[in-house]
Amino acid sequence: MLSKIAKLPILKRLIPSLAIRILKIIGKNRGYYSIRGIDMYLDFLDPIDREIILYDEFEKPEIEFLISEIKRKKLNYFLDIGANCGYYSFKIAEKIPNINIFSFEPNPEAYFKFSKSLLKNSRLSNKIKLENFGLSNENNKLKMQSMIKFGYAQTGGSTVIKNNI
């Protein structure tokens, strides 16, 4: 219901703005949200998490494309590189019966949220292996930085700021 109301043009900006202000005041911006039957630990102040919470069909065309390609090519493995909160991993685990998913997330905060969601979704967690590091074509250590927006570090949109640390 909230996702339908939130799509109305006048409310599309107003609802998130009001919710952010209220949640900052009461300090309850994090928690479990049921996203089409998947319990995800999300933070309403994080822009990607907020999109997932408010708009039921977050990145639906992209996910449908991936699912159709996995089925068409009869793939057994899916690599979710830069998995963030695990949304893609969970959606694919839910739709593809015999898939093995390897999810990689170097950001400690995003990894934490994904880990908590895995614990709540035992029916899907046996398909997903989560690792707390990034992937590259080189064996190297890199320093990453999250983008800061409105005083809040976003878990999506991190960038490498220093090579060979």
Task: Describe these PLM feature segments.
Residues Y55-N137:
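SAM cofactor-binding core of SAM-dependent methyltransferases
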Residues R30-S34, A83, K141-K143:
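Ser/Thr- (and often Asn-) enriched beta-sheet segments in non-cytosolic proteins
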Residues P9, Y41-D46, E69, E94-K95:
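A short alpha-helix capping/helix-coil boundary motif
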